[in-house]
């Protein structure tokens, strides 16, 4: 197993970790009810997907 020869400094370790971040989710606007929703997914508010209601239990907007 590999063992480090030198102790890595705090700044070096933190520089390496700058790329490990969580990206914010991409949101789009539902064309039916104008609510924010994830792309390629049914709207959680009205249940519309590609101009059709795919959730019969959703309230009509």
Swiss-Prot record:
GO terms for biological process: translation. InterPro entries: Ribosomal_bL32, Ribosomal_bL32_bact, Ribosomal_zn-bd. Residues 7-20 have a biased composition (Basic residues). One of its GO terms (molecular function) is structural constituent of ribosome. Keywords: Ribonucleoprotein, Ribosomal protein. Residues 1-22 are annotated as: Disordered. The keyword Ribosomal protein applies. It comes from the Bacteria. GO terms for cellular component: large ribosomal subunit. Belongs to the bacterial ribosomal protein bL32 family. HAMAP family: Ribosomal_bL32 (MF_00340). This is Large ribosomal subunit protein bL32. It comes from Desulforapulum autotrophicum (strain ATCC 43914 / DSM 3382 / VKM B-1955 / HRM2) (Desulfobacterium autotrophicum). The lineage of its organism: Bacteria, Pseudomonadati, Thermodesulfobacteriota, Desulfobacteria, Desulfobacterales. The gene is rpmF.
């Amino acid at each position: 197993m590999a063992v480090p020869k030198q102790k890595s400094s705090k700044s070096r370790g933190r520089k390496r970790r700058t790329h490990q971040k969580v990206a914010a989710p991409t949101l789009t606007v539902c064309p039916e009810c104008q609510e924010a929703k994830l792309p390629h997914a049914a709207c959680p508010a009205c249940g519309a997907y590609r101009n059709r209601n795919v959730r019969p239990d959703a309230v009509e907007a």
